[in-house]
Regions:
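A conserved ligand/cofactor-binding region detector
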Residues: 1-822
Length: 822
């Protein structure tokens, strides 16, 4: 069901758009104007399908999943939309005939700054799969004006600057002011009796903003389905107070405007201070309240009985950020729709499902009662009542067991615990990899699992092959299609048919030549952006992901320092040349993570400029890691660094993207690494380090002293001393003292070497040597790389979504008809 593409009509559409938008011809327009004109021409193709999809959903009155997420890391839209419309090559030809280069045009588009890490990219992959599989769904998030931040590296330091992605406009969004809703903050709750003697609650003396939706299309691959991502902007109720302005009170004149603007300014405002915490809670409630109001309004267009709302809608809560959904839905059902508590609870507990993404305590959000109750007074009353009823249940089920109440209560010790709220009120709780779900059930959420075993299930994460192979690695995609056909584009399990080619020497050479071409492409990117020459024949060893101590970028760079020491001591060391590639953003307030970035860059500066090692070791930190440069990186990688402390990474999806592009995993038995090794076999990955059970045992029982390793391992001692002797910072030898101290000394309640970097160091070094030995065997390496691709079928987000549909959402596929089909 591809698009019937008319080349001449498309060319005319581009030319007409330039004329209407800019009063220019193709020859006169600049690159950004060409991008806008081409995007609007592609949007024209989308519109018929988008309208047809929405009409079909309304006509068939379908059950719909609303995917609620603070982040949607969508990347660039133009190329993805053309791929999924199956017109990419047609449009490339049309533009060639106009004298325009599609690659240059695509590069004009900024990545949509609606997310940051794996959480947001997962949400984007899920939307892609839902549309491709034909399931009724839409995403709800926030239209951040500046995203998290744009990362610049200056003198080795991360500098955060606003990511002004909307400065030229977003051609793929449509503002929908007719679906705006008021969202209220603060004030107090007045209770009164209605004529039937029932308690009624009204929020008074509040401040409010208007949530205005912008719709973005989510195009399914080759099937006419176009779902929607709704991103909410905040506008003031009254834009400008002329009376205050005329009195000279200029701040008050624009106070309403600033209240609204602040909510949507940035993703994850720094919450190291009270104002930042308040802003985060405001953001969460803002998009949740608007999204529920929109869903209920849509429901009431075709249904009259609000008590059956859960038969048509299910909210999937992506991590704890949107879990206030539970209480806000209760509020709307009771205060605005007139249901009693039991009726509202029946609806709510059948339409809220929660995905847990972490066992890190810091990410299981808790809000101080004072803040929560002041900002959301009526919602807090409802949370209090949910907690009161649940604690009564606990007292009956576990009489006298105060420890259970402490762990499981929604409100305890002055805090509102959002994960507990989601579990108590949700009908489903899922982890995102087998190991992660096991840890939740046996450790972190053990008490809840014992009480509600039927709620818990696993849904191993996945990625969309359409972006990370078909679009990101066209050379490999074409090669695969030439071997097995193109069914893999919508059913990744077909990749297993490549296994018959892994021993074929001609196929091995073709495969490795494609890898080499992709390495040349990345080397060119690095030269243009970093000014560093890297050898495309070296091993490209890559770690790109959010910077966090548990992900252990520090272990990686300490090992690079160790390798450098070895090469300096023995210039004839028989190891292949290596290029270590990092890409990561650290949260603005996360000091040790930012210091780790500085360390990586200082080490790079020393190593890359040392002629004595003859270019056999290079270190590159790729600035402003994002979806669009990730596609280039994944395609070029030889080694995929997945080295989180075992038990800490819920799943990871970068590991899957590397695997799909033919990189070998070097990692711990953590997250989805466990399942990757199960699929590809232990011979085609290199695993090292403590197991999750061993890590948890050390954390619970103690028995690990990093100082012992420091005293007994000369290599480790040398590397750590280089952190504080000026080796990598002559002007300030103490620069990296905090990193040194974190590895060797307890600090308050924090244990030395919290993430077992020194404990795993020697095993990591040995694993590296083993990986390099594999690389020297060219045929063996080619076979392993090909097997990684052939065994990646399980890790499609299409498979993940089918499991969510089967076990949680219970949706039906919808077929959308459009008149211009082939």
């Amino acid at each position: 069901m591809g698009v019937k593409f008319d080349k001449d009509e498309f060319k005319k559409s581009v030319a007409d758009n330039l004329k209407v938008l800019y009063r220019k011809t193709v020859d006169e327009a600049d690159k950004q104007q060409i991008f806008q004109a081409v995007s609007y021409a592609v949007k024209d193709i989308i519109m018929d399908r988008w309208l047809a999809t929405q009409k079909t959903y309304e006509k068939e009155d379908v059950r719909t999943v609303v995917y609620m997420s603070m982040e949607f890391l969508m990347g660039r839209a133009l190329g993805n939309n053309m791929i999924n419309l199956t017109v990419y090559k047609d449009i490339k030809e049309a533009l060639d005939e106009m004298g325009l280069d599609l690659n240059v045009i695509e590069d004009q588009e900024p990545d949509a700054a609606l997310g940051n890490g794996g959480l947001g990219r997962l949400a984007a992959c899920f939307l892609d799969s839902l549309a491709t599989l034909g399931y009724p769904a839409y995403g709800c998030g926030i239209r951040y004006r500046y995203g998290m931040f744009k990362q610049q590296i200056k003198d080795g330091y991360q500098i955060e600057v606003p990511d002004n992605w909307l400065k030229d406009g977003n051609p793929f969004e449509i503002k929908r002011p007719e679906y705006s809703y008021e969202v209220k903050f603060g004030g107090y709750v007045r209770c009164y009796k209605d004529e039937d003697g029932r308690d009624k609650f009204v929020q008074e003396d509040y401040r409010s903003v208007i949530a205005v939706p912008y719709d973005m299309p989510v195009v399914g691959y080759g099937n006419n389905v176009v779902n929607t991502l709704i991103i909410w902007d905040a506008e003031p109720v009254n834009t400008f107070n002329l009376e205050s302005f005329n009195k000279g009170d200029y701040h008050k004149a624009i106070e309403q405007e600033n209240l609204a603007k602040n909510i949507v300014e940035v993703l994850y405002p720094n919450d190291n201070h009270y104002a930042g915490k308040e802003l985060r809670l405001k953001q969460q409630y803002f998009f949740v309240s608007a999204s529920i109001q929109r869903a209920i309004a849509k429901y009431k267009k075709t249904n009259s009985d609000i008590r059956k709302f859960h038969e048509k809608y299910v909210f999937q809560l992506n991590d704890t950020h949107p879990t206030v959904t539970v209480a806000e839905l209760m509020r709307i059902l009771m205060d605005e729709e007139g249901l009693n508590w039991e009726e509202a609870w029946e609806v709510t507990t059948h339409c809220c499902a929660y995905t847990n993404h972490t066992i890190m305590a810091e990410a299981l959000e808790k809000w101080p009662i004072e803040l929560f109750s002041r900002l959301l007074p009526r919602v807090y009353q409802i949370v209090e009542e949910i907690n009161r009823r649940f604690v009564e249940e606990l007292k009956v089920k576990y009489p006298g067991n105060q420890d259970k109440i402490r762990k499981m209560a929604v409100i305890y010790d002055g805090q509102v615990k959002m994960a507990n709220l989601a579990i108590v009120a949700g009908f489903s709780v899922n982890g995102v990899a087998k190991l992660h779900t096991e840890i939740l059930e046996k450790q972190e959420l053990k008490d809840f699992y014992e009480m509600f075993p039927e709620k818990f299930n696993n849904k191993t994460n996945g990625i969309t092959q359409r972006r990370f192979l078909l679009h990101g690695n066209p050379l490999l995609a074409d090669w695969i299609t030439g071997k097995i056909g193109d069914d893999w584009i919508t059913d990744l399990s077909h990749l297993s048919r490549l296994k018959v080619y892994v021993d074929d020497e001609k196929c091995q050479r073709e495969f490795m030549q494609i890898k080499y071409q992709n390495k040349l492409r990345l080397a060119k990117y690095i030269k243009e952006n970093n000014g560093v020459e890297v050898d495309p024949r070296s091993v490209f060893d890559v770690q790109v992901k959010r910077l966090h101590e548990y992900k252990r970028q520090l272990l990686n760079i300490l090992h690079v320092m160790y390798l450098y020491n070895q090469l300096k001591a023995n210039p004839d060391l028989d190891i292949p040349a290596q290029t270590f590639i990092f890409g990561a953003k650290a949260a603005a307030g996360y000091k040790i993570a930012k210091l780790t970035i500085k360390l990586i860059n200082n080490v790079a500066d020393v190593i890359n400029n040392d002629p004595a090692i003859k270019g056999r070791l290079k270190v590159v930190f790729i600035e402003n890691y994002r979806v669009s440069n990730a596609e280039i990186i994944f395609a070029a990688a030889d080694v995929s660094e997945q080295i989180s402390t075992a038990s800490k990474e819920a799943s990871g999806t970068g590991n899957m993207k590397f695997m799909l592009n033919g990189a070998l995993t070097l990692g711990t038995m953590d997250g989805a690494n466990v399942e990757i090794v199960q699929e590809v076999g232990e011979d085609n990955a290199v695993i090292f380090g403590l197991t999750s059970d061993e890590v948890i045992r050390y954390e619970n029982e103690g028995g690990y002293d990093p100082m012992e390793i420091f005293n007994n391992d000369q290599d480790v001692r040398t590397v750590l001393m280089q952190l504080i002797n000026g080796e990598y910072c002559r002007e300030n030898p103490e620069m990296f003292r905090d990193i040194y101290n974190s590895l060797l000394h307890n600090d308050g309640g924090r244990r030395a070497d919290t993430y077992f970097i020194l404990k795993d160091f020697r095993a990591y070094a040995d694993a590296h040597r083993k990986m390099l030995d594999k690389y020297k065997d060219e045929k063996g390496w080619a076979k392993s790389a090909m097997l990684n691709v052939a065994c990646a079928g399980k890790f499609s987000s299409d498979r993940t979504i089918e499991e969510y549909v089967r076990d949680i959402w219970k949706l039906d596929k919808v077929k959308v008809e459009v008149s211009d089909e082939d």
